[in-house]
């Protein structure tokens, strides 16, 4: 960890980095439709599933739920990455787990990761949708009663939606920001 990851520049990033100290800019937003529904029962389980850059909105929702609302509802976060170095905020989520017994963080790495092993970081090798199914949903009493919030690459979203559909989860319980399409 540490350092920067080289990524292709986006329109906004290019604009921001072209500014000079003292330049005035106007910012608005964020605008989007990825948010928790109002009036959910306090006991309804929330399952967050993220991958790649999907960490940012997931973290925002989870910080609000636990640091602002101090929610007591059952919540889990299943995050998939290629390697530990591509999984930010792991320590932060473990700290929330310690403070809130109703929260579980689960890290899925695509393959065994020597760096994670050396650091003693707990993870499950595999794709996040398979890890979620094998380690939780296949034995869940009522997966159709949970609310699922996802943000990540299109292939991840499609795999999770198919799995949830196969489990009989109604589409209104599946919320996602498909930023890759």
What label would you give each PLM region?
Residues 35, 57-60, 159-160:
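Phosphate- and divalent-cation-binding pockets in alpha/beta enzyme and binding domains
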